[in-house]
Amino acid sequence: MIKILLADDETDSRDAIVQYIDWEGHGLELVGAAGDGAEALEMIKTRKPDIAILDIYMP
């Protein structure tokens, strides 16, 4: 499976993306959902995702 990390500072948007995408059905594993850039960086270091989906207007 391809490991995905999601980062978005808007909780509603982040939760909707996490909830409504059939990650496993697309051969993906969601390894984390971060609420800010610092949290995303830590998750990238420890969880080693193949792809990071980032909100570019995030603190």
Put a short name on every predicted segment.
Residues 11-32:
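Two-component/phosphorelay signaling modules centered on CheY-like receiver
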Residues 5-6, 32:
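Short hydrophobic beta-strand elements that form part
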Residues 58:
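Receiver (REC) domain active-site loop signature in two-component systems and cognate sites
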Residues 33-42:
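Helix N-cap/capping motif at the beta->alpha junctions
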Residues 47-53:
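Active-site beta3 strand of CheY-like receiver
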Residues 8, 55:
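Active-site residues of response regulator receiver
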Residues 1-3:
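Non-catalytic signal-transmission and effector/linker regions of two-component phosphorelay proteins
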